[in-house]
Amino acid sequence: MREFRWYLRMLAEVHHGRERHMGNTHDWLQLQKQAHREFALRLAAVTDWEAPTPDTDWNVRDLVRHVVEEQQWVPQLLAGRTLAQAKRELAPLGHDLVAEWGLYSFAATEAWDAAAPDALVTLSYDRVSVTDYLREQVSDVAIHSWDLARAIGAPEELDRFLVEAVWTVFEPQRDTLAASGLYAPPVPLPDDAPLQSRLLAITGRDDRLAA
């Protein structure tokens, strides 16, 4: 019941949070909730867990497991634990990934809401601020929401404010991302292409291709 009340509160906050979005200022806590809502909507529509995804090494099950596992880490790292300490606290995921998503999405959101924005978090590559970690996590869930939508044939359009915010994270790093090997090569698109298409293109995704 507590989780259900929280979910209703999250949806209401996302709706009202849009009214507070102005210019280049982004309320990343609201965007985290919106990103999780985007993913949850697609997850609820999954019927074929073996379907391929735009992440060519993953099927739908693998993709969902990755996103859920990322949420498992959030409360541990925000509590100040090292990677080794956090890893010891992580439980293996169960077979019901929809239920696991609900559990760990809730826990992650509660942890984000309670975290001090300027506190430092130990990640695999550096110590960063809570705010930087939050932006990274919002961006990851947003992109994978599109991946999941494409994989299952669900609506692919993401929330406009979410896309605009993630663009401010990825666009300044386009050269770094291209050189990282984490993504396929960027897809060339004209400057007047939709912002979501250009965002996806930075990560090597081409939404013009047939699903």
Where are these regions (language model features)?
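Structured surface interface patches that mediate subunit assembly and partner/cofactor docking
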Residues: 3-17, 21-31, 35-56, 73-93, ...
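Extended, alpha-helix-rich binding/interface surfaces that flank or overlap catalytic cores
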Residues: 63
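A conserved catalytic-loop motif detector
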Residues: 68, 98
